[in-house]
From Swiss-Prot:
Domain of life according to the entry: Eukaryota
Binding site for substrate: 137-150
Gene: omtB
Location of region: Substrate binding: 177-197
Family: Belongs to the class I-like SAM-binding methyltransferase superfamily. Cation-independent O-methyltransferase family. COMT subfamily.
Annotated protein name in UniProt: Demethylsterigmatocystin 6-O-methyltransferase
Originating organism: Aspergillus flavus (strain ATCC 200026 / FGSC A1120 / IAM 13836 / NRRL 3357 / JCM 12722 / SRRC 167)
Keywords from the named record: Methyltransferase, S-adenosyl-L-methionine, Transferase
UniProt-annotated binding residues for S-adenosyl-L-methionine: 228-229, 253, 273-274, 289
Pathway: Mycotoxin biosynthesis; aflatoxin biosynthesis
Protein's GO biological process: aflatoxin biosynthetic process; methylation
Enzyme Commission number: 2.1.1.109
Gene3D superfamilies associated with the record: Vaccinia Virus protein VP39, Winged helix-like DNA-binding domain superfamily/Winged helix DNA-binding domain
Amino acid sequence: MTGLDMETIFAKIKDEYARTDDVGKRQIQGHIRELQVGFYSDWDVVMRLSSGPLQVALAKVAIDLGIFRSLKESDTPITLAEFVKKTGASPRLLGRILRTQAAFGLIKETGPQEYTSSAFTDVFANSDAAGAVVQLFDISGPCTQILPDFLAERNYQDITSNKDCVFQKAFGSDLTMFEWMPQHPKHMESLGHLMALERPVSWVDHFPILEELGKFPAPDKVLMVDIGGGFGQQSKALRAKFPNLPGRLIVQDIPQTLANAQPAAGIEFMEHNFFEPQPIQNAKFYYLRHVFHDWPDEQCVLILKQIIPAMGPESQILIDEMVIPSTGVPWQAAFTDLLMMNSLGGVERTRAEWDDLMEQAGLEIIQSKVYDSKEQAILVAVAKRT
């Protein structure tokens, strides 16, 4: 087969990928992954799999040295000598690091000791993507390394407590991760970036908010309380999508998180611990995104029970989380499930597990819509009918 034929095939795949929806993109990614493995020898498979931790470490080094941002901002390739001048690093050491980063595609080699941006570079020049990598390397990385020994020591029993999970063993602490994090501001900051990282598909494009809104009473009433809402990225997305929606949008989170939140028109920020009674009464929506997967069932029920007394007759709880299918679980969902288990004793839940959780809290799910190929969904819960 000629090089031209390969280029034609590659162009067709790129074109199809650009035109297809989220489900189609996932299918193409899966086929490419299978194709790659089919071409590998046993040695290749072992080395490729084992290189994962090193690739993340190399990305972290590039973030720390500002390599990604420098390449993104430069119109011309940057030489090793220029990077040495920028960073103060040893020429020999930095040369070895840069060539390995290039070998894995994190950056692109354009000549001897000369580099430019790759597709990965452009991603990690984004502060939220970079912060997400830092968080996963610093926190999830040590937990992942310890996981096999932890499971063996516990005879492979369920992890159901955030006070007795892999995190405590990895970090030598009796604290839960959320108790430990505020004592380490740099990790709180990177967690905020991970939470703020934009997903390719948003709930605001799929939830029928105008229909559910009904006859919302007045602009001075609270339309939505974004509980545990971090920097307010979901409320900002809602306001951007529907700029004329009546009512107030309130983002609630702990002070350490809100300290890094940027003000936004039409968005209010309020310090609140969601284990304490909800102070905002009669909001139309109480929205929680990626809150419940952080917690075991007992704490999830407690969070829900803090909201219920504040709800009015027309109030709804919107839960923006994954709903794990019985088969064909996307790797991103399965990966996240074990990350939550390791660090927090948390879990990504099936629909049956969500129903059971609502039952324990005195709620019921009246609507459920999976809105992306990674099984992210909106669950609408109300007080259980008697």
